Amino acid sequence: MVNDLDVYVATSMRNKQDFIEMANTCEKIFKDPKIKDFHLRYFDPTISAAFGHEDKGIIECLMVRCTKVLIYSAGIKESYGKDAEAAMALSTGKPVIFYCMDSTKADFYKKVHPLTKLIDFSTGVANGAMVTFQVQEVVELLRRIFYNLMEYKLEQPKKGYFRLVEVSTDSAVRVQTNDELLTKSFWNYFDRFVKE
């Protein structure tokens, strides 16, 4: 059954209000008419339970591994758990949507934070998160992902430096650097590591 998971919602909830807000957010996303007919199977973090924190961690890692898309719900406070879940999804090449409460935090993740783009361990390609602060944009991204209607543009801010940018969120989802030393060092090590 876990291999049927479409969307994993990564979040951290510390108090009753956090649980209520997360439940409302999940309802707004997954009951939206644009995607309701998909009958997406998603992990609702407000009803998660396990016998202990070790079991909970193992279950959640398995769900992240099996899901098709991960939504990272950036709350007021950050937590290691949801950061690790987003990192696992990015490092396995999955689409990751960062949903932020406000545009300031969204801009931080989109334009400043270096780890919203991580290397896909199987290909060596940089995989970046799509970042938004609007629930409707999360819904639209899910619709486009599952209908295979994603739209991208290729940017070249400097000679030899390329960014593949998701159009609606203006988020870089793939990056190629023009730093020759970094490129050669990376691929020499990565290729050797993969062959071992």
Predicted regions and their residues:
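Conserved catalytic or regulatory cores that recognize and/or transform ribose-phosphate-containing ligands
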Residues: 1-196
